Structure formats: C-alpha cells, structure tokens
A protein has these predicted regions:
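Helix-to-loop junction immediately C-terminal to a conserved catalytic motif
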Residues: 48
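Conserved ABC transporter NBD signature motif
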Residues: 56-71
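Conserved ABC ATPase "signature" region
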Residues: 95, 99, 105-121
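Catalytic Walker B motif of ABC-type/P-loop ATPase nucleotide-binding domains
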Residues: 149-153
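Helical segment within the ABC ATPase nucleotide-binding domain
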Residues: 163-176
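A short, surface-exposed alpha-helical micro-motif characterized by mixed small hydrophobic
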Residues: 190-192
Length: 245
C-alpha cells in the first residue's frame, strides 16, 4: 500500500506539487493521470526517495522508505527507460541490481523470462529498442518480488503485442495481491485494467475515484475520455484547437 498525505514540493519559487493526498491499495491498479506538467513524475520520484518532499508524509506498506531493512522485497520502481549503462547486457544490468538488493543471481533468469527478454539477456542494452528498455525497467521493478510496484509510463514504446503483454502482467500482479501505482496517458488501458484513478493538474489532485465511477461520470462513445477532459480542461498547459479554426 502507498499512502501519500498532504505532500507538497517546491523547486525554488515553483510549487510543483500542492498538498497531494491519495492512497494506492494492495490487490489494485491505481492510475495516476494528468496533463504534462501536472506533477505526476515528481510525486513518483518522492515515493521512490529520489526527491525530498517539502512537506507532508509518504508511507509504503505502513512504513517510511528509509525504515525498510529489505526494500527490494517491499517496493519496486520503473521510472525511466534510459537509466541504464548502454555497454551492459540486460543480464549484467539486473545482476548488479540484484546484488545491491541482497539477491542471488538465480533471481535474474525468471524475471528476464517473465518480461520476455530471456533470449536477449546477453545483448548490450545500448542496442535495445525503446520497448525492450521498457521491459528491462519492469524487470528491475520485479526483482525481489515486491509487494508494491511504481511504474511511470510503462506502455511507452511498446508495440501492440507488448501492450497486450503489459496488460496481462499488470492484471496478474494485482490478482497476486500486489499494489500497483501506474502513471499513464493511455486511457484505453486505464479503462481495461484500472481499479482506481487519481487525476492531477497543476500539482493538485483534481479527482480521486474508482475507475467505474469515473466512467459513469463521462458521456458519449468514450466516457472515460470525456470525463478526463472535463476534469482537466483548466489544467492543460499546451492547448490547441486541432483541425478547427
């Protein structure tokens, strides 16, 4: 479980995250949505301990991140597809992460197989496609079989097969009782897999409700999309008129 309580973050004069509160529960897929610049990535970096909060508290499975003696079994992160040494193979990349987490190298093979990279385990990641890098990031998050996972835009760069694979993976992990917090712009996947949806805009929480309640609030042939657009209409930094004049 992830609990974010009254969290704010300032970068100089800019208030990037403003009094954000929400929870992501075990056995569920909680999506964090919002326009570019809404503060989603900053929130995720604060959960990961990469950015300090200016105020408020964050707990994971009832404890602060620094209180864990075995963090890798509590929470896993995939926050950027390019946080890799391009000269390392996929196997080497996971090996040093496993060692840092106190795991053995025997934990690496099953994870590479689960994300579909077992056949390219000895290929340098500098030769990976964007979609393969996304799979490697998810493999990193899965090391240690953590109770909680935080994934930032995991579907970016995936082809159709990859999106279907990711969908089944997320649903399977939730069915195992894991807590998943996922930032996304893919409303189709949110509608298929989501349990709860938190929508941010300009650093604030604009909506925090179940996926089903959000869909019910929408209208037309794409109700989730219509509800999202209505909620975020005053928070879009780069608005355009599309094909109209």
């Amino acid at each position: 479980m992830i609990s974010v309580r009254d969290v704010s973050k300032r970068f100089g004069e800019k208030l990037a995250v403003d009094d954000v509160t929400f929870e992501a529960e075990q056995g569920s897929i909680t999506y964090l949505l919002g326009p570019n610049g809404a503060g989603k990535t900053t929130v995720m970096r604060m959960i990961a301990g990469l950015t300090r909060t200016s105020s408020g508290t964050i707990s994971v499975n009832g404890s602060g991140l620094r209180d864990f003696r075995d963090t890798i079994s509590e929470i896993g992160f995939s926050l950027g597809a390019f946080a890799r040494n391009p000269g390392h193979t996929a196997e080497q990349h996971l090996r040093w992460q496993a060692r840092l987490g106190g795991l053995t190298t025997s934990d690496i093979g099953p994870v590479l197989y689960r994300v579909g990279l077992d056949q390219v385990a000895k290929r340098p990641v500098g030769k990976f496609s964007y979609g393969m890098l996304q799979r490697l990031g998810i493999a990193s998050a899965l090391l240690g079989d953590p109770k909680t996972l935080v994934l930032d835009e995991p579907a970016n760069g995936l082809d159709i097969e990859g999106i279907i694979w990711l969908r089944e993976l997320l649903l399977g992990l939730a069915a195992e009782g894991k807590c998943l917090l996922v930032a996304s712009h893919n409303l189709t996947e949110v509608e298929i897999t989501g349990t709860r949806v938190v929508i941010m805009g300009k650093g604030k929480v604009l909506s925090d409700t179940s996926k089903d309640e959000l869909v019910t609030a929408g209208s037309g042939p794409r109700p989730l999309e219509s509800a999202y657009v209505a909620i975020t209409k005053d928070s879009v930094e780069y608005a355009a008129t599309g094909g109209t004049r």
